[in-house]
Amino acid sequence: MENVITERLEALRTELRREHLSAFVLSAEGSCWISGNDKAEGIAVVTQEDVELWKKKEYPTLTAAIPAIAEWLQEQFEKKKFQSPEIGIDGMQTSTADVEALKEQMKHRGGITIRTNFDPIERVGKNNPNPLITPIKLISPTEQTTQKLARIRQELRKQHADGMLATRREDVAWTLNLQTPDETGGKAAESYLLIASNKATLFVDSRRASNEVRAYLATQGVEVKEQKEISKGLKDYFEYNILVDPDEVCYTLYKKITRIVVFGESPITTMRGVSS
């Protein structure tokens, strides 16, 4: 296992040199891949010389670790260990709030800039076995999706929003009466629910959506599209504005939005908590 970790680190560092990045803040998925463990032990930052780990016990989330990460990166910068004043973080795996917080921290720590449009793990991990594609399963609802969507839209109006993007797995599953997906499913398990005033669209890996699931969602007024079409879906979103929960929606998708953004807490999370 030690040899595997060494090989993976070298492959990652090769990609960082190619992209002129001095460091990379790994997502939970990336940390798992580097360590070879199924579950991340913490948040890892990789440079050309070091690997620093902020253990999950002390820093349960990236949000909690950002000040410590920023301080450590500044120390590396001051020791002239960085050839480039730019570091990377995967914008598809990091919330808008966390990216903005890290950018703000680094701006005042030597002017280090953040790049979010690059995922080195996706490049160097191509020879890994594909993650298990678990099919979506329906659950017996106590409330139909049409009713939930009506209540969600009512709450959105209270926040002066015409629609919203839901990306939290539990929220998407609850709204659509689907079984909550396994956290170990990686990017293949991600799904996005785009809600407008008169339509809703689920963007999901098509291999996971059976005909039964598609048929049920169609009766509930929910269209199913391929996961990778989410960027186009946000571009084509026709409402005046859209609600974005910065603690939920990833930075990359937030930057794809062309309409006015209303920042606020997702009403789905609150509704789900009340119903459970």
Regions found by a protein language model. Name each.
Residues 1-276:
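Terminal domain-start leader segments
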